[in-house]
């Protein structure tokens, strides 16, 4: 693959030196480079193949980094990164010490705002626009947001606020990759986009509105006629009701449409809204045919595509959950499965196929997902909310106010708890223990392996109140998983290994690492199973017959399971040395999960080192 033009682009300033006729060729080179690069490292592919032309056009037209571009979610920002001087860094994308898979302010001045969670771009760009206005700085502010992210309430909250904010420059680009434009409509839309984004049209519309303001009935008639005319070839004028000048839809892969339209919009003050239609996987037929499969692939050969992987020897926790959900739904017809746009990631594909009437993908709407579950529970249903730990943060008020306060029977299956690897700090599920254990009525369970995951899911489901089960990304230790739906006593742990002098209290999958360390120092190991209700009896019994305790968790130490143990000891008046091991008060960057844990001293060797360093005298 030749990259003659791409080789000349070290920054957007170089891009803007090109003749516009060269952009199509550059787009082909950039798309080919994205495909080759991601196939070697893994990462998000379909979305990035779909934003090549849009990225080129934005940096070609706008004066970045002076003008601000905010990429919503950000997993579609690889072309942007390549065009802004990080082409060489793509070789280590999402690897420890390498560049992030998302925009990151500390990585480049072109990353105006850090993103990874959805629907934040318009709010951030609006804040920047107001700051520029207040400082007397003339610049453009662009929020690029996908059709999925646009469905979330936060995006509409931002547009509502923008509509009453005077004297700002804000362009929202809706990257719509869930529809297509037929050639005839596309040609007409391209013409209309140029017309509606032009200064004459904008000026004429504003003058006409000012004149007709004195004749309200005529103004209303003119407004309706304009909406009717545009409605023949464009979506409803919802966005104009927020005060935006709506333009589009136009083909997001047609640079001859994108560039002049953006140039026109750049010259217009105020609120502008450009609707572009793109195709996920554009230019790579395999990804076009199955954009979900190629959404976030690992390494693969582009010539043959992603091959069917051999069944792994060990099940992932997501698979264990998915099978449990189907089995429990077979037994209990009250069970309802809910996910906020994470069907594949949370393991609900089979559940949707088998129980379509009881499956609800509510879209990127975590707040709604939680309160929707609360409403179901009020009427005797048994909702299970399958959600990533990091995304539950977005529904926290609803969890407290709508579920826990009313003690409603809702089960939360928290996937990606702890470190998540390549996605990094933005997706890490490090905080759920701390923010859940302080909520009255809430149960917090942390299984140590696949078998325990099934047991604790059943236990929490049968509990008549709010409950959560947290489990990590990836495979477990290979524990055999039964087919039954047995439960265990709520709030009771068990001793997995008897030792001397030191007892390790493990919460979650780090119990396995604790067992490895204990074998070297002859320590007792308890699988605590529950952070809340904590097995107070077991904690005090272990404290009574050991000289020191160690708590281990893949979660934030501050406010975590170790804190619960310390609170129990203090309440009982027990004075005993306690070593807390877990995630530090810091955001952990991206990298391999196992390597990150080892670097934090949370593998077997690291746990042993920490215990020897703190309690060496007890081991002599």
From Swiss-Prot:
InterPro entries: Dxylulose-5-P_synthase, THDP-binding, Transketo_C/PFOR_II, Transketolase-like_Pyr-bd, Transketolase_BS, Transketolase_C, Transketolase_CS. It catalyses: D-glyceraldehyde 3-phosphate + pyruvate + H(+) = 1-deoxy-D-xylulose 5-phosphate + CO2. Thiamine diphosphate binds at residues 75, 116-118, 148-149, 177, 284, 366. It comes from the Bacteria. Binds 1 Mg(2+) ion per subunit. Binds 1 thiamine pyrophosphate per subunit. Mg(2+) binds at residues 147, 177. GO terms for biological process: 1-deoxy-D-xylulose 5-phosphate biosynthetic process; isopentenyl diphosphate biosynthetic process, methylerythritol 4-phosphate pathway; terpenoid biosynthetic process; thiamine biosynthetic process. Its cofactor is Mg(2+); thiamine diphosphate. PROSITE patterns: TRANSKETOLASE_1, TRANSKETOLASE_2. Catalyzes the acyloin condensation reaction between C atoms 2 and 3 of pyruvate and glyceraldehyde 3-phosphate to yield 1-deoxy-D-xylulose-5-phosphate (DXP). Homodimer. Belongs to the transketolase family. DXPS subfamily. This is 1-deoxy-D-xylulose-5-phosphate synthase. It comes from Bordetella parapertussis (strain 12822 / ATCC BAA-587 / NCTC 13253). The gene is dxs.
